[in-house]
Regions:
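Short beta-alpha connecting loops at secondary-structure transitions
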Residues: 38-42, 95-98, 284-294
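Short alpha-helix plus adjacent loop in nuclease-associated cores
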Residues: 98-118
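Active-site core segments that coordinate phosphate-bearing ligands/cofactors
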Residues: 5-7, 113-126, 130, 136-171, ...
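Short beta-strand-loop/turn "lid" adjacent to the catalytic site in phosphate-handling enzymes
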Residues: 63-100, 128-134, 163-183, 208-213
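Residue-level signal for inorganic ion chemistry
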Residues: 23, 46, 75, 102, ...
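Pocket-flanking alpha-helical
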Residues: 86, 107-111, 245-247
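N-terminal glycine/serine-rich phosphate-binding loop of ATP-dependent small-molecule kinases
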Residues: 1-96, 123, 151, 224-225, ...
């Protein structure tokens, strides 16, 4: 029986879990990934450090696995959505990764709400931009760090950065592509969407869209040396963690509501038609012709972490 490696990077912890093909956990490991808050409303982390922690978790999971790494048939990653992970044209991190807890672009999102941009975005993309949406963050970067904005080569999501580290290839998947820049009807990029946000200069930087289960690349010798994986192991495109959560819980189906209590509180349901509204995001489902409607609030497990760090530090360290 072959093995599968799943990687899950949330807003606090990165995890590597090895499963058999019956879905049983064979081994697992995790690493806490530090966040930095360099100024008010900025929540970010070092992209190279994120990969290092993830590689260590993979290595630990392999060490705890009673079977060799050569038994792993495929790898896939999932991670938090929204936020921003930028590379330059040479594939180097251009700035710290911005988490979906970041709110530096709040004024931009509010302005778009007032001037009609948000309404147009809802009509075309299925969602109104919010403070940590890639569209708002890129507009913030254009206004506040124009030199860095001009050097953007690739606009990625978190799990796409981790896959790049594993394979050296640039791509995203159907679910993650719909965080800001896809047509809600066609579920693909459209020429008129980037200009809604004044971001038409970045048409070259959007990654190719793959099916979540498509092979997006293979483990490079460099990644194999860091992790203990076998070079050449296939790596699938993966998917947004919100959608992955409902799928893993058995809640990815029409007429079923899935509830996620992680760093964010999320309520989601799948439909065979694009249903849009101001109170939720309508994003791509796992397959063409499927949509995932999700209502999201950043008021869940992260609040518990803050409470424990602030009031129970001694007990937590014990």
């Amino acid at each position: 029986m072959s093995l599968l490696l799943g990687i899950d990077n949330g807003l606090t912890v990165t995890k590597a879990v090895i499963f058999d093909t019956a879905g049983r956990v064979v081994s697992m490991a995790r690493r806490r990934v530090p966040q930095s808050l360099p100024r008010p409303r900025h929540v970010q982390r070092d992209m190279t450090g994120l990969w290092t922690h993830t590689a260590e978790a993979i290595a630990d999971a392999l060490s705890a696995c009673p079977r060799p790494a050569s038994d792993i048939a495929c790898i896939a990653a999932t991670a938090h959505g929204d936020g921003l992970y930028l590379l330059d044209g040479e594939g180097r991190p251009l700035a710290p990764g911005i988490l979906s807890l970041d709110s530096r672009a709040g004024e931009i999102a509010a302005r778009w709400q007032a001037d009609g941009t948000a309404a147009l975005a809802l009509e075309r993309t299925g969602q109104r931009p919010h403070a940590s949406a890639p569209s708002a963050l890129l507009a913030w970067l254009r206004a506040n760090e124009p030199d860095r904005f001009a050097r953007i080569g690739h606009v990625l999501a978190c799990k796409d950065w981790l896959r790049f580290c594993l394979t050296g290839g640039i791509a995203t998947d159907l679910t993650e592509a719909s965080t800001a820049f896809t047509d809600v009807a066609t579920q693909d990029y459209a020429d008129d969407i980037l200009p809604i946000f004044g971001l038409e200069a970045l048409s070259h930087a959007l990654p190719p869209i793959l099916a979540p289960d498509a092979v997006a690349g293979h483990v490079t010798p460099q990644a194999a040396a860091l992790t203990g994986l076998v070079a050449g192991t296939p790596v699938a495109a993966g998917l947004h963690d919100v959608t992955a959560s409902s799928l893993g819980a058995g809640g990815y189906a029409e007429g079923v509501a899935a509830i996620v209590a992680g760093t964010y509180s999320i309520n989601e349901t799948v439909s065979r038609a694009a249903r849009t509204g101001p109170g939720w995001f309508c994003r791509n489902g796992i397959a063409p012709g499927e949509w995932n409607a999700m209502a999201i609030s950043p008021a869940s497990a992260s609040n518990y972490d803050w409470f424990l760090d602030t009031f129970c530090a001694a007990e937590r360290a014990a």
